[in-house]
Amino acid sequence: MTDRTAEQLAQDFTAMGHSVALITDVIAGNAMADEDAAERQGCVDRNTQHLELMVAKDDWGSESMTATNAAISAGNGYTAS
């Protein structure tokens, strides 16, 4: 795997932040409230999987993964109802 450029790292980290926000908002009921449970679950599952793949990359620098890891834990524990 080729290391990502600083610009790519920044873009990926920003995208991860969007996934963190979406997972958090769906779980809190602030996003996708009008969607059915399967749609909400699918959204959380996809974004959680994305974060798991991204956090596993080995070319991160000093970026904090605290919020990302919290969102992964929350997403993995989420069951839409």
Q: What would you call each of these model-derived segments?
A:
Residues 1-81:
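Beta-rich interaction/scaffold domains
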